[in-house]
Amino acid sequence: MLKRKAIASIKNWVNTKNKKCLVVQGARQTGKTYIIERFAEDNYEELLEINFKQMVSAVDIFSGDLTVDNMVMAMRFRFPEKKILPGKTLIFLDEIQECQEAITSLKFWAIDNRYDVIVSGSLLGIDYKRASSYPVGYVDYLRMYGIDFEEFLWGMGISEDMIGNLCGYLESKTVIPEAIHSQMMNYYRQYIAIGGMPEAVQKYVDTKDFREVDKIQRSLLLGYQYDIAHYATAEEKVKAEKCYLSLAKQLLDKENHKFQYKEVEHGGRAQKYFSSIEWLLRADMVHLSKLVTDVRFDLDDYARDDFFRAYTTDLSLLMAMKDFSLKQHIVENTLEGNSKGGIYEYAITDALYKKGYQLYFYKNETTKREIDAVSYTHLTLPTNSL
């Protein structure tokens, strides 16, 4: 089983006084359901899990009065084998986008405050807009991402103490011994080729077989395409899929990594496709890095909405859009040309995205110098040399 940092975040939520319902957000197949189930197993006497895709008729639990007592009574009749006890039972509503009344009910669970309720689902940014009454102010949020490089190292057997020792070299500005550096670069190239989707990482941990990983990556990509076909409006289905499948070409096949609509379709224009990018963004299928015209606070004040780079939400999905040989070149360190620059730009951007940073990039029109990833932290960034 892969160790995930999100477990600690859920523990913090549980220990919060007067906690609200927890909404676990994130892209498809990033491990949301697995993490919640594992957490419940270790921290509660009972887990009551309702997956609204699997249990279609379970929506009836939320069809009447949405008082907590009524909902709990309906759950007890539906699941008589389950003990539903305050503080001892975790109520987990999965694929909640399939039941809009369950979304509305979160307000009443939070006000009542006797039961611990966690919800999750795919494309919540799309479906929450259809809820009859969204529970603003009554939910806490946890965003889950694919596995990051540190979590990948844990999966490969590298302990936290070993990683701490490595960080010690960096913090003291000491040269890392070549044997360690070389092995870490091998791990990093493996991680780039595999990506952070838990199923792909677990397959590599178990088999060390990139061909098996490739099968999973392509299956995951098909799942994303299915979601576009299933959830997008009739007007957006084809356009959103075209935009999504163009991302590898946008990032790896040309020197300029700006998202260009002409790469989606010959003669393509923003007027036709920008709404599809917005849909993919709300659906947690892409994240964007916008051009900023100046590197100063607040970066968003200098951002251009019409000039951006678009990335898949995990490296696994980018790998699935390209031939298997790309993984071979990455692992063997034989990448050249635009693909090499694009892959490593993407890898750094992916790492920052998984830390929760809003990303931008900068280009000085006078010197033509570029910074591929710009974000704001408590650190002061020198700008006089740009």
Language-model regions, residue ranges each:
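N-terminal pre-Walker A segment at the start of P-loop NTPase domains
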Residues: 1-11
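Conserved small/polar residues in nucleotide/adenosyl-binding loops
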Residues: 377-383
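Accessory nucleic acid-recognition modules appended to NTPase machines
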Residues: 206, 212-371
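Conserved lysine of the Walker
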Residues: 32
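Interdomain motor-coupling "hinge/lid" segment immediately C-terminal to the ATP-binding subdomain
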Residues: 130-249
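Hydrophobic anchor at the beta1->P-loop junction of P-loop NTPases
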Residues: 24
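Hydrophobic positions on the alpha1 helix immediately C-terminal to the Walker A/P-loop
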Residues: 35
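Short glycine-rich substrate-engagement loop in P-loop NTPases that contacts/grips substrate
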Residues: 57-81
